[in-house]
Amino acid sequence: MNLVKLKYYIITIALFAGSVQAFGQRRSVDNLTYFDERPLHFGFYLGLNTMDYRITNFNNVYDNPVFTAHPELIPNAKKYYNNKTSFAAEDYTILPGFTVGGVVNFRLTRDFDLRFTPGMSLGSRSFKYFIDINKELVNQSSGMDEKTYLTTPSAYVDIPVGIRYKGFRHYNLRPFVYLGAAYRMDLENKRITESVVHLKKNGGYAEVGLGLDSYLEYFRFTAEVRFSYGLSNLIRHDADIAKPTPYYGYIFKELNSNIFTLIFYFE
């Protein structure tokens, strides 16, 4: 984890702690004492997110299935790569994003709830790649250009579902942990990144979160930090050769998505 990411996570946790203190530090009476006994309730949420990739590069770029299926690409690739075979790319920086959605909460038992929280997340990822290209070929054909930093925006339709385990309520505060899964469809990547790298639009995620419910006079306010771990390799090695990936895009073996979100619920 680089220093920029560490600072971001520290700031996020500080915001989480501050929101909990702001909404839960005063108590005169117990609010909403029967709130958790409702079999079904609704709400909405707002959040801040950051997205990144877990990047796996080919040890030898010519192991990419595209070159196996289309060997006619290899001669130009060798010129472009200056006859080198190994390159690297890494996640570069933190770019903040925004999340919004709704809540459908089903009470299962005293301590367990089933949560359905569909929404939308807007964000971007940025990575840096290290490749010594043949500059004589730069911009000679479509898609062949020199890039060092690459940003890929995303507009996700989020479909998460999970189980929340609630701890003991202490006055107007109640901690919880969340375990779940999510399916996400990216509405943005095809339009923006098709000329850069071929990505799948859909992917599955495992999710874990923790937070604190604050029972106010008229509603329940909740702050939660959640980590979404992408299970799908988003790279499409079988992309249509009629829309070839720029040569620097062939170095990626796997791109897996991570999303870190600070969420504020109003229920």
Enumerate the language-model features and the residues they cover:
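Short glycine/proline- and aromatic-enriched beta-strand/turn motifs that initiate or cap beta-hairpins
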Residues: 23-96, 267
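Extracellular loop and loop/strand-boundary signature of outer-membrane beta-barrel proteins
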Residues: 29-31, 85-90, 144-150, 192-198, ...
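Outer-membrane beta-barrel channels and translocator barrels
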Residues: 37, 107-111, 168-172, 215-219, ...
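Residues that define the transmembrane beta-barrel architecture of outer-membrane proteins
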Residues: 38-42, 94-98, 153-157, 173, ...
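Residues on the lipid-exposed face of transmembrane beta-strands in outer-membrane beta-barrel proteins
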Residues: 44-48, 98-106, 118-120, 155-165, ...
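Flexible, surface-exposed loop regions and adjacent strand-edge segments
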Residues: 59-66, 130-140, 193-199, 238-246
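Outer-membrane beta-barrel transmembrane domain signature
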Residues: 151-154, 165-222, 228-238
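Predominantly the C-terminal beta-signal and adjacent terminal strand-loop region
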Residues: 214-267
